């Protein structure tokens, strides 16, 4: 009897670390692709991208952000000559990319 009880407890603990993903049903027709699934119906959303800005950026832990200005992130990484003034930047808290 003790062996059965021990086996049951071990089995339940082994299954306890699984993550179950559920979906709340509503009348939404919006579909998105997630990391693990395609065409998942959107049930609720929160806008995380800021649409307005005051023009000033905060430093984090004493490090200033790097503003790419008219340069794109890809252009900075690939060495676009328009991004030459960013070459000497070796440390920053986050990257600010302006919309073009």
Swiss-Prot record:
Gene3D superfamilies: 3.90.209.20, Hemagglutinin Chain A, Domain 2 (2.10.77.10). GO terms for cellular component: host cell plasma membrane; membrane; viral envelope; virion membrane. Its main location: virion. In natural infection, inactive HA is matured into HA1 and HA2 outside the cell by one or more trypsin-like, arginine-specific endoprotease secreted by the bronchial epithelial cells. One identified protease that may be involved in this process is secreted in lungs by club cells. Palmitoylated. GO terms for molecular function: host cell surface receptor binding. Belongs to the influenza viruses hemagglutinin family. This is Hemagglutinin. The gene is HA.
